[in-house]
Amino acid sequence: MAFEPAQHSFITLEGVDGAGKSTQARLLARALELAGYQVVSLREPGGTAISEKIRALLLDPANTAMGDTCELLLYEAARAQLVHEVIAPALAAGKVVLCDRFYDSTTCYQAFADGLDRQIVRDANNLAVADTHPALTLVYHITPEQAALRMAARGAADRMEAKGMAFQERVYQGFCAIAAEEPNRVKLIDATASIEDVFAQTVEQVRAYGLDISQDAVTAALVQEAE
């Protein structure tokens, strides 16, 4: 599968809450930087002043009255600003962009879990990203039950995390469906393994997409994480 040069270094990390993708995003960013790449690390929603304000609205547990369509459009507004202000310029400059969640999360949460029409969600995603699509998406594969055990120590849940196990199960099924539909772009990572083993899988997939990460960089990233 061929990729445009500006898009080849756009990697997104996805999964249910508690899958460990944020840890892997941090490790991957360190390893890539140690390997000599310029890396922009982001997480959604957020990443710009405007997007962070929208994030606060979306995740505030007090906003229980928020409707599904309102939620979708807020996510897309935050994403559109992030692409416009940060992602597209970084890719044009030849940087590697890592994003902890992107539009696949919207598909899973708003279409599969909330029940919005999938084509409407797809159209909204496409409008927001303006042809800036990830070349590689890593889905950290773990069941909602396993993820819930990991999250138990976190304390208070945000508005999305508090939606319950049935909701998280639909999100999980959504990620499984997307991985089956787009195997060239979306790769499943066994997130039930140790952090080191999960990172080894992550690096293997990133290397397969043409980014050279030495074993020394991998080891150093893990050492820094443990400090």
Residue positions per predicted region:
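NTP-dependent small-molecule kinase module
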Residues: A2-E4, L27-A29, E145-E227
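Walker A (P-loop) ATP-phosphate-binding motif of ABC ATPase nucleotide-binding domains
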Residues: F10
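Hydrophobic anchor at the beta1->P-loop junction of P-loop NTPases
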Residues: L13
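Walker A (P-loop) phosphate-binding loop of P-loop NTPases
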Residues: G18
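Conserved lysine of the Walker
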Residues: K21
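Hydrophobic positions on the alpha1 helix immediately C-terminal to the Walker A/P-loop
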Residues: Q24
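ATP-dependent small-molecule kinase phosphotransfer cores
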Residues: A35-V129
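A glycine- and Lys/Arg-enriched "phosphate-lid" helix/loop adjacent to the NTP-binding pocket
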Residues: R101, S105-Q173, A177
